[in-house]
């Protein structure tokens, strides 16, 4: 029986959200860093578009095993312990990115950075959702996840305000700050009360396909894959696409800043609306907004118009992604929650890895920006349908509502 008072529970929740927000902030900065530094990296290492696609995808490839293994280890050894190790890992390899000396070393540094980033996210979600409990879980996860687009906006600010800085600058920031956070997390981050109160064993992956969770697992995987395909294509390729459309690098960084501000706004707005709107309305809002914004990004020619298109793209693309992160913990019990979230994130990372590679291939074939954006439309429609079914069925397929 819990002995925590309401005030102590509230303090624990706020401390957890605050510290996890800071980690999410640095995760967002590092995820955006390669896109912001792309021009400098390509020039410094004389890389073509396909090679840059591999730079982008190496980091995303690392996210996949990181999310899968990080979630499983967290259900066995604790969310806090694995999160701290993850933060140390992506901080160290962000620094390694800044001192890379050739293409292979750069790819390896981005790969290992991705492993750390991937392992961190399911633990951020699990810690926050379990500290909040069922009633405030969606809101708490949305507040925490706001750190990701805000961190990405900070990276864009470095690109916009520091156009004359070395390309390594964003990676120095993305490495030093996480390493400073490590001792703070060790001292102040509470372990999940749900995890601490249970005897843990490594959950088998087949537990995700038990009768009460199989439908949710498959639907989550489907919508994660296609939504993250679009999000990471935008994060990695949009700055270079804008420059090819005739915008200045500083203007491209400004559009990325607008995109991430839209993402932060969408994370809060869509998270708050998740339990208030009908499923069909929510699904139509998110995915029709994504389609419209991609069309605008491929066709708008004015800088002000592109700023607006970037903001709307962030609002619905990353905002929609945050809704998925808030939804996922609802469908799994505490014994398999980090594993369930981690595997969904890992499948999403497959989409995230595919997006930059697909865009690079299409650009190499000469399809241009419009072709890249148009190719994303079928995936958005599939993801929208999966989210609609998932949200419609969640009251029937949610196995439990533990804290």
UniProtKB/Swiss-Prot annotation:
PROSITE patterns xref list: MFS
Gene3D superfamilies noted in UniProt: MFS general substrate transporter like domains
Name assigned to this protein: 3-(3-hydroxy-phenyl)propionate transporter
MF annotations from Gene Ontology: 3-hydroxyphenyl propionate:proton symporter activity
Subcellular localization(s) per the UniProt record: Cell inner membrane
Membrane topology category: Multi-pass membrane protein
Annotated organism of origin: Escherichia coli (strain K12)
GO cellular component: membrane; plasma membrane
Induction of the gene: Induced by 3HPP.
Inhibition and activation profile: Inhibited by carbonyl cyanide m-chlorophenylhydrazone (CCCP), which dissipates the proton motive force.
Ranges that cross the membrane: 17-37, 54-74, 82-102, 106-126, 143-163, 165-185, 218-238, 254-274, 280-300, 307-327, 340-360, 370-390
Keywords linked to the UniProt accession: Cell inner membrane, Cell membrane, Membrane, Symport, Transmembrane, Transmembrane helix, Transport
Domain of life: Bacteria
NCBIfam families given in the database record: PRK11551.1 (NF008586)
Name of the coding gene: mhpT
Cytoplasmic topological domain residue ranges: 1-16, 75-81, 127-142, 186-217, 275-279, 328-339, 391-403
One GO process term, biological-process aspect: 3-hydroxyphenylpropionic acid transmembrane transport
Outcome of substituting residue 272 to H: 30% increase in 3HPP transport activity
Result after altering residue 75 to A/E: Lack of 3HPP transport activity
Reactions mediated catalytically: 3-(3-hydroxyphenyl)propanoate(in) + H(+)(in) = 3-(3-hydroxyphenyl)propanoate(out) + H(+)(out)
Periplasmic side: 38-53, 103-105, 164, 239-253, 301-306, 361-369
Function: Uptake of 3-(3-hydroxyphenyl)propionate (3HPP) across the cytoplasmic membrane. Transport is driven by the proton motive force. Does not transport benzoate, 3-hydroxybenzoate or gentisate.
Family: Belongs to the major facilitator superfamily. Aromatic acid:H(+) symporter (AAHS) (TC 2.A.1.15) family.
């Amino acid at each position: 029986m819990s002995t925590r008072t309401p005030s102590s529970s509230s303090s624990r929740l706020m401390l957890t959200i605050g510290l996890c927000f800071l980690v999410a902030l640095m995760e967002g900065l590092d995820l955006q860093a390669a896109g912001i530094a792309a021009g400098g990296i390509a020039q410094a290492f004389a890389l073509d578009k396909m090679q840059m696609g591999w730079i982008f995808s190496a980091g995303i490839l690392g996210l996949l095993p990181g999310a899968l293994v990080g979630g499983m280890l967290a259900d066995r050894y604790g969310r806090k312990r694995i999160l701290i190790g993850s933060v140390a890992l992506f901080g160290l390899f962000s620094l390694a990115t800044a001192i890379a000396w050739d293409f292979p070393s750069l790819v390896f540094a981005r790969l290992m950075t991705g492993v750390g980033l991937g392992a961190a996210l399911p633990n951020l979600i699990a810690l926050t959702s379990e500290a909040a409990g069922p009633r405030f879980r969606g809101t708490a996860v949305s507040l925490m996840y706001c750190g990701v687009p805000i961190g990405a906006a900070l990276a864009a600010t470095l690109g916009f305000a520091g156009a004359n800085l070395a390309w390594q600058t964003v990676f120095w920031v993305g490495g030093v700050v996480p390493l400073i956070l490590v001792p703070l997390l060790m001292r102040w981050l509470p372990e999940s009360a749900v995890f601490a109160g249970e005897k843990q064993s490594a959950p088998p992956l087949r537990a995700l396909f038990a009768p009460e969770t199989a439908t949710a697992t498959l639907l989550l995987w489907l919508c994660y894959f296609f939504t993250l395909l679009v999000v990471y294509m935008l994060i990695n390729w949009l700055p270079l696409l804008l420059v090819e459309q005739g915008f200045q690098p500083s203007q491209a960084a400004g559009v990325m800043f607008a995109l991430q501000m839209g993402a932060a706004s969408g994370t809060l707005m869509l998270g708050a609306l998740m339990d208030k709107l009908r499923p069909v309305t929510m699904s139509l809002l998110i995915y029709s907004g994504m389609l419209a914004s991609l069309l605008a990004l491929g066709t708008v020619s004015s800088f002000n118009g592109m700023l607006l298109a970037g903001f709307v793209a962030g609002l619905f693309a990353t905002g929609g992604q945050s809704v998925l992160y808030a939804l996922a913990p609802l469908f799994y019990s505490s014994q398999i929650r980090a594993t369930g979230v981690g595997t969904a994130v890992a499948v999403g990372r497959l989409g995230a890895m595919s997006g930059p590679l697909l865009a690079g291939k299409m650009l190499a074939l000469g399809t241009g920006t419009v072709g890249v954006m148009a190719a994303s439309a079928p995936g958005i429609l599939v993801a929208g349908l999966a989210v609609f079914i998932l949200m419609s069925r969640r009251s029937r397929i949610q196995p439990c509502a533990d804290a």
